[in-house]
Design a protein with these regions (language model features):
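Active-site-proximal cap/loop segments of hydrolase catalytic domains
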Residues: 17, 32-35, 96-99, 107, ...
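Active-site-proximal beta-strand/loop segments in catalytic clefts of secreted hydrolases
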Residues: 18-21, 50-51, 66-67, 91, ...
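Contiguous beta-strand/loop segments that form the cofactor/metal-binding neighborhood of enzyme cores
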Residues: 127, 139, 144-304
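A contiguous active-site-proximal alpha/beta segment in oxidoreductase catalytic domains
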Residues: 85-87, 93-171
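Short helix-terminating capping/connector loops at secondary-structure junctions
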Residues: 38-44, 138, 233-235
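N-terminal glycine-/serine-/threonine-rich beta1-alpha1-beta2 phosphate-ribose binding loop
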Residues: 1-88, 97-112
Length: 304
């Protein structure tokens, strides 16, 4: 899906693609070739199985890292070291230490790194941030953020690895003998996509391969909350996980005293991912395609 965004930028040419599944690189190459031909471009899109080979090319300016999150750190660090700027999908890193190493690589190599937090550009989230910062509901007392459940133990049965997939390379830094191939982790695709084709890898939902909804949706929702309360360049100073000393929900406390609780807040849709800001003069609820406020007059007219 990110290809559409790059394609809309004048002068951008997609020169190469890399994946551990050769079926995916071939399908992507065909899609790029069709698009570039329609624009009168003759840039060839080369295919790679190992990203290190791609990074050796001097004619490539920037890389997108859209792998499972266990590869984000190494791919980003190596891209920076090879002189490439990086657009990395969220969540930025698999662990905190990896994230710090990525920041160091960007700064040491004077590169540009952008993270896929496109939700912040959506009108309803921009409006919510502005409303909070402009005092629409007074002093913020607490925040509820609903992102979903943390990861669960891997419980998928082992299945034969497709011939077109290098599963050892897919695992990469994980190096865990408990992890084995199952199509839910890395869904097979065809060159001629079916209407009901499954593309969403379930690796993100398991402890051994991902960080669950907490990272997948938290990267979006926690980002909005931090931006609204002026903690954009920081993070919580205290985290209490769900179940610790009998706590029902996870909480994050910030240096300014505000506590964000990860729990449902919409009675009619408890599974919805979104945020509720509670102030001493009202509340604001925001999710994708939705915004509400205790004082309807505070909502921008184009969002009512």
């Amino acid at each position: 899906s990110d290809f559409k965004g790059f394609a809309a930028c004048p002068g951008v040419q997609v020169a190469a693609c890399c994946d551990v599944d050769t079926m995916k690189t071939e399908r992507f190459r065909r899609r790029v070739a069709e698009w570039q031909a329609s624009k009168g471009m003759n840039q060839r899109c080369d295919q790679y199985e190992f990203y290190e080979d791609l990074l050796e090319r001097k004619d490539i300016d920037a890389i997108e890292v859209a792998t499972p999150e266990n590869w984000h750190a190494l791919a980003t660090i190596h891209s920076c070291q090879s002189g490439k700027d990086v657009y990395c999908q969220k969540p930025l890193a698999y662990t905190i230490s990896e994230g710090l190493a990525m920041v160091k690589a960007v700064r040491n190599n004077k590169r540009v790194l952008q993270v896929g937090s496109q939700q912040r550009s959506s009108k309803e989230f921009q409006a919510a941030i502005d409303m909070v910062q402009n005092g629409a509901i007074g002093h913020i007392e607490k925040i509820y953020a609903r992102v979903g459940e943390p990861p669960t133990p891997l419980s998928l049965p082992e299945m034969p690895v497709p011939a077109n997939l290098n599963f050892n390379q897919w695992m990469g830094p994980l190096n865990d003998p408990k992890i084995h191939y199952h199509p839910d982790l890395c869904p097979p695709i065809s060159l001629d996509p079916e209407e009901n084709e499954k593309l969403w890898g379930a690796w993100r939902w398991y402890q051994e391969t991902g960080n669950g909804y907490t990272a997948d949706w938290g990267a979006h929702m926690f980002d909005i909350a931090q931006a609204a309360i002026g903690m954009d360049g920081s993070g919580p100073v205290e985290f209490t996980p769900k179940g610790y000393n009998g706590t029902q929900y996870s909480t994050m406390r910030y240096a300014n005293g505000i506590v964000m609780t990860e729990q449902p807040y919409l009675e009619d849709n408890p599974d919805a991912q979104g945020i509720k800001f509670v102030g001493d003069n009202g509340w604001i609820e925001v999710a994708r395609g939705y915004i509400n406020c205790s004082d309807q007059s505070k909502i921008p007219s184009d969002l009512k």
